[in-house]
């Protein structure tokens, strides 16, 4: 059987969409370099 999120194949990163949004915002991207993506995203867009 196949389980979603199993070790077979590359499981999609649930935060990938938010990471892309932050990377497209120069201010969020810069802040992420200093405090990490999740915290930078939270400051700009609210809870991840």
UniProtKB/Swiss-Prot annotation:
Annotated S-S bridges: 22-28
Residues with the 4-carboxyglutamate modification: 16, 20, 23
Region forming the signal peptide: none
SUPFAM superfamilies: GLA-domain (SSF57630)
Keyword Disulfide bond among record annotations: yes
Annotated binding of Ca(2+) 1, by residue: 16
Keyword Secreted: yes
Cell compartments where the protein resides: Secreted
Every Gla domain range: 1-46
Keywords: Biomineralization, Calcium, Disulfide bond, Gamma-carboxyglutamic acid, Hormone, Metal-binding, Secreted
Top-level division of the source organism's lineage: Eukaryota
Binding positions for Ca(2+) 3 per the UniProt entry: 23, 29
Function according to Swiss-Prot or TrEMBL: The carboxylated form is one of the main organic components of the bone matrix, which constitutes 1-2% of the total bone protein. The carboxylated form binds strongly to apatite and calcium.
PANTHER family for the chain: OSTEOCALCIN (PTHR14235:SF0)
Family from the record: Belongs to the osteocalcin/matrix Gla protein family.
Name listed for the protein in its UniProt record: Osteocalcin
